[in-house]
């Protein structure tokens, strides 16, 4: 990210990436799913909560990062670029499936009937492919990265905004014609997912898989929007000094954020904001808010120089996908590894929440305290990598 005229390195990008990863880990790991503060819950169906922002914020930043990473290929599709995209897409997708398999293995092993032999227990724990979820967060990241990267290398960049508009408009028409705003199995998204993926390989939520096949279409547009903002930030800015460069970025990001957010909320009267179907208005509003938040971070960190507080999130941001995977693996281990306690046994998760935190903070505050403690444990590992300048690229 260097220019012969001015350094275009933006620390705020790493910090926002780290904030979103820490946020994703936090909302996925409460002490008790039955005791969560309202802002830390996903919207039941239509609507938006702070929790609904963390994943789309990361995808927006992925779009900007994709622009930066593909720039070294001069945005020309060649063998090296194609193989890099293909390899990374496959690796991220398979890691997502591996996490799903690992979760089933650990939890079945921990709860298997006592009358099974070791071999039967091992086989039953290992062979869960007949009911493993095919899609998920990592899989969506993989598909969106792969599709957006290929588009960026094969299409004139000035035409990408029209493609984004076409994808979102076409998806809205699909939702309108296919009962796409219904929270049940008559929804076209559910119909397609159940026909292709089959229910055994889907997330169970009234027949709706929040990372399903058709809703990947607007998610690709989401990453492309981030790509376009990255292009506007880094190549649309010809400032001769860093201060002017950063100030110009602030204005650009803020204006883009206001326009997208206002447009999304305005259109939400006809197209509800909905994360589970990744509605077009959800794309506009979350990209707009991400752009505005990035502008705020650039002003605080890169312009004003208030950086000391940001080191915590930078430890997450420099190894984002690794830290997310680490959080998923630790969550599975905390929930499935048990030890004797009294007349029965208790998991690490259960011990920390029920025995250590809940008696001190209460049910809901204790649930939040567990999530924060879990983030701190992940950070300790991430910080060791950050301190040693170890960057694990996935």
Pin down the residues of each PLM region:
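Alpha-helical transmembrane segments and their immediate juxtamembrane cytosolic regions
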Residues: 1-394
């Amino acid at each position: 990210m260097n220019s012969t005229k001015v350094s275009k390195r933006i620390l705020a990008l790493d910090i926002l990436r780290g904030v979103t990863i820490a946020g994703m880990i936090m909302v996925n790991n409460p002490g008790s799913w039955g005791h969560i503060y309202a802002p830390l819950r996903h919207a039941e169906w239509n609507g938006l909560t702070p929790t609904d922002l963390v994943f789309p914020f990361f995808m927006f930043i992925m779009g900007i990062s994709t622009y930066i990473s593909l720039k070294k290929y001069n945005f020309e599709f060649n063998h090296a670029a194609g193989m890099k995209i293909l390899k990374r897409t496959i690796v991220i997708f398979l890691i997502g499936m591996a996490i799903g398999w690992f979760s089933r293995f650990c939890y079945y092993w921990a709860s298997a009937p006592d009358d099974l032999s070791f071999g039967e227990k091992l086989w039953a724990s290992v062979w869960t492919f007949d009911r493993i979820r095919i899609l998920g967060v990592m899989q969506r990241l993989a598909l969106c990265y792969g599709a957006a990267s290929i588009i960026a290398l094969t299409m004139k960049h000035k035409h990408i905004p029209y493609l984004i508009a076409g994808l979102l408009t076409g998806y809205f028409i699909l939702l309108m014609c296919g009962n796409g705003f219904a929270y049940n199995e008559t929804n076209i998204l559910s119909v397609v997912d159940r026909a292709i993926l089959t229910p055994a390989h889907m997330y169970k939520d009234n027949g709706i898989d929040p990372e399903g096949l058709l809703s990947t279409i607007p998610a690709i547009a989401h990453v492309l929007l981030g790509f376009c903002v990255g292009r506007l930030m880094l190549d649309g800015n010809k400032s001769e000094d860093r201060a002017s460069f950063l100030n110009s970025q602030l204005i650009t990001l803020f204006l883009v954020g206001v326009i997208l957010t206002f447009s999304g909320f305005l259109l939400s009267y006809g197209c509800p904001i909905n994360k589970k179907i990744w509605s077009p208005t959800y794309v506009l509003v979350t990209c707009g808010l991400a752009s505005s938040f990035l502008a705020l971070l650039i002003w605080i960190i890169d312009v004003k120089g208030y950086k000391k507080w940001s080191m915590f999130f930078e430890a997450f941001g420099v190894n984002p996908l690794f830290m997310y995977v680490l959080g998923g693996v630790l969550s599975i281990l905390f929930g499935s590894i048990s030890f004797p306690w009294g007349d029965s046994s208790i998991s690490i998760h259960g011990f920390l929440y029920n025995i250590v935190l809940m008696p001190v903070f209460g049910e809901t505050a204790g649930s939040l305290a567990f999530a924060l403690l879990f983030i701190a444990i992940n950070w300790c590992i991430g910080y060791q990598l950050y301190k040693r300048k170890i960057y694990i690229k996935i």
